[in-house]
Amino acid sequence: MWGGRFSAKPAELMQAINVSIGFDKRLWAQDLAGSRAHARMLMNQGVIASHDGEEILEGLARVEDELLSGTFPFRDEYEDIHMNIEARLRELIGPTAGRLHTARSRNDQVAVDFRLWVRDACDRTVGQLEALQKALLTQAEAHAESLMPGFTHLQPAQPVTFGHHLMAYVEMFGRDAGRFRDARARMNECPLGAAALAGSPFPIDRQQTASALGFDRPTANSLDSVSSRDFALEALSAASITATHLSRLAEEIVLWTTPMFGFIKLTDAFTTGSSIMPQKKNPDAAELIRAKVGRILGSLTTLTVVMKGLPLAYSKDMQEDKVPTFEAFDALELSLLAMAGMIADLTPNTENMAKAAGAGFSTATDLADWLVRTLNMPFRDAHHVTGSAVKTAEGLGVDLADLSLAQFQAIEPQITKEVYAVLTPAASAASRMSYGGTAPAQVRAQIARWKELLA
């Protein structure tokens, strides 16, 4: 491919560090798509003869058959997927294969291949996120009224419903899907035709190849086209945020399955045992999802560091863009699929959840709110009175609802027996009727909205 300039073969170590076919073979479908679009454009523009173009297209179809059947002969001496396919095309149809590279460089070829792959990965990820959201919606709808403690600092804070808690993740994953859609929209420009860096002297039609490959338009600057990998960085950023959300949900699943919490139960399908402790049933799927964020965020860091000091245009450093991107999306796909399966698999222990919902004086804020509404007390004063009530109850070893009216009135004489109506977890949750709140009616409204969005 470039032997005319060289009189000796590269050293074995040079070949070893330079070859990329071991990982970029994953781009074969994208490479074929780009080559077909390029060949048809060259024919239409009269850059190559129609009979040559048709021979090339027929040869590419034969190459595709070999790739699909697993009989394609990948060879390290051809370095990468582009030259492997071109070399095989030459073996199948002869020297006409050499016309395919007219008005094209490997620089714009790999740019379009990789952009197509990342675009497809974004589309797949959106579908996987939506499947996870639907699994969460199913559980949330079944448990729109199931009480559980809401936490701050992992301490009981206020009663919420299990459905409301799960809907928080539906929102997070919805934003994640939006980030992938946004990244896709920005990357949907075709770099093919930029050639090495300066464009092509041939009368090519870049809009034709862009349209053929499903892009909105060609990239506007040939130098930027082959120099940039920000489309992959943006996709990896979205992947890292998604993995962070998955890790948080996984951590809660790990906590909730412990005997100390006892909020949910996982079946054998998503747990493993111990080689020494017969009683163990470990939430390994959740733990592994929790850990995957390290690999995914590491991939973003890797590619950022690769790109940070590169002058324009292409440098061989950019060959290192693919492995971290492939690994990140492989890990993310597995995590999303496993999480969706685990969410569908889990069974909440609503009795334990409801019992825990009232722990830690979780209705204290409801008492303070009652003092504000009923006695027209400034909230800071109500906060102080409620704190005194909590201190009294704690000293007696009882809950707020177990204090007698006399004990309440010893703290604040204006308190009446009506206060007891707000001191149950169910009443607390039901009262949170503000938009987006945990009241079952609000939770059902959130569920209905997302069902419509995901329909």
Swiss-Prot record:
| GO MF assignments | argininosuccinate lyase activity
Gene Ontology, cellular component aspect: cytosol
Q: What are the disulphide bonds in this sequence?
A: none
Q: What class of enzyme is it?
A: lyase
Task: Name the SUPFAM superfamilies on file.
Answer: L-aspartase-like (SSF48557)
Under Enzyme Commission nomenclature, its number is 4.3.2.1
GO BP term, pick one: arginine biosynthetic process via ornithine
- Give the reactions, separated by semicolons, that this protein catalyses: 2-(N(omega)-L-arginino)succinate = fumarate + L-arginine
Localization of this protein: Cytoplasm
Q: What is this protein called?
A: Argininosuccinate lyase
